[in-house]
Regions:
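Trp/Gly-enriched beta-strand/coil motifs that build multi-repeat beta-propeller-like domains
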Residues: 36-406
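Secretory targeting and sorting signals
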Residues: 1-33
């Protein structure tokens, strides 16, 4: 499918997300010999519409195509990567890009328009059109928040997981850094909120889907992560939601909250400051399975204690649970409705630089905004410091075709 960079704001995320990639262009079946002639690990093309005649093949990027320029008509992607067919030389993207999905078996074929001038191979679909990671900008806070900042520069950071299982560190200046080369799709929960290991650096906690183990990845203070350490031996798949919270127990150490699937109970796991968790304490007797998002957002109401933001699935309402010593105070309505249109919630501290904790969200397909709509709009809701939020600000539209934000 031809995808134009000029379409994004309203439709590009949706269009790309629905592309079947490499299964398009039905027509007369090409000669089987032509398909089987394409070696494993190669992308192949023919000048004919039925895959016969002289074959072009490559397993590396081609900035120019020589005599094959603007001649591809039928193609096979016999690789495990996405293949980007660019209308211009040198992988330029202003005109259009045809995207062909991985087909390691090499049995699928299709048609492309005879306008291809360069070919590139990438691990994820979005990299045919955009960088592997989205844009992220944050203002410099007046003081360190103690969380949401992996490199201690007082700019809120984001971790992004892509569909290839890589982990990217976004430092708040629009740039990105690869901090996890592979394997992160094996984690079905990733959370962070401050220092759990006692070295004054923010850490990352991950739950391993296959084992239910909880792992601590110590922050290096630069955005990268150290060697993981076992934090919970097993059983964590029994929890429907896990949130790194900050200090709820009142001992100055970061804690973890978890909702038990079978009971809907909310448990507090106090941090020890040494990378482990203490004996759990019940802080919510029931009903927490009714919440479809939990965010340790820092001090939202200005009382000096960390608070919890929760989304109620049945109503789309957003609730603030004020932190007390080892418990929560009475909840306060923070957002009346519509919050089910958000895919992800991020509590990163002060994003806008006004000294108040803010809330960041990433939208679902149902979102309709002023300048952005659909999947992958990134919004900032500035905190007022009294438990309320100001109107949203649409700050980016390229947070789509990824696999999680933390």
């Amino acid at each position: 499918m031809r995808v134009s960079l000029l379409r994004r704001v309203a439709t590009m995320a949706t269009t790309l997300g629905l592309t079947s990639l490499g299964l398009l262009g039905a027509g007369a079946a090409p000669a089987q010999a032509a398909i089987s002639d394409c070696p494993a690990g190669y992308f192949c093309a023919w000048k004919s519409e039925n895959g016969t005649g002289t074959m072009f093949k490559t397993n590396t990027n081609k900035a120019t195509l020589g005599t094959w320029n603007n001649t591809f008509q039928s193609v096979v992607n016999h690789t495990s990567k996405f293949v980007c067919l660019h209308d211009d030389t040198n992988y330029s993207k202003p005109d259009g890009v045809d995207i062909w999905g991985p087909d390691p078996a090499g049995t699928e074929w299709g048609h492309t328009e005879p306008t291809v001038s360069s070919v590139s191979f990438v691990p994820t679909e979005r990299e045919c059109i955009l960088p592997a990671y989205p844009q992220w900008y944050a203002s410099t806070a007046s003081q360190a928040a103690g969380f949401g900042d992996l490199n201690a520069d007082r700019q809120a950071d984001v971790l992004v997981r892509d569909k290839a299982g890589r982990l990217w560190f976004l430092r708040g200046d629009g740039s990105g850094q690869l901090v996890g080369k592979s394997g992160w799709n094996g984690m079905n929960a990733l959370v962070r909120h401050g220092d759990f290991s006692g070295d004054a650096r923010e850490d990352v906690i991950a739950r391993e889907a296959s084992t239910g183990k909880l792992w601590l990845y110590p922050g290096a203070g630069t955005g990268s992560l150290g060697s993981r350490k076992l934090m919970g031996n097993g059983g964590w798949n029994a929890m429907s939601r896990i949130a790194a919270y900050g200090d709820l127990s009142g001992d100055g150490r970061s804690d973890v909250l978890a909702v038990e699937k079978s009971t809907g109970k909310l448990w507090l796991y106090p941090g020890t400051g040494t990378g482990t968790l203490g004996a759990r304490k019940l802080i919510g007797a029931s009903g927490w399975n009714g919440m479809s998002a939990l965010v340790g957002a820092g001090d939202m109401n200005g009382d000096g204690r960390a608070d919890l933001i929760a989304r109620q699935a049945s109503t789309g309402q957003l609730w603030l649970y004020p932190g007390k010593a080892g418990a929560f105070g009475s909840r306060v309505l923070m957002g009346n409705s519509g919050w089910n249109g958000m895919d992800s919630f991020l509590g990163l501290g002060d994003v806008t630089g006004d000294g108040r904790a803010d809330l960041v969200t990433i939208t679902k397909s149902s979102y309709v905004g002023e300048a952005c709509r659909g999947v992958g709009c990134q919004l900032v809701y500035p905190g007022r410091g009294n438990g309320a939020l100001d109107s949203r600000v649409e700050t980016a539209g390229d947070w789509w075709n990824l696999n999680g934000f933390f």
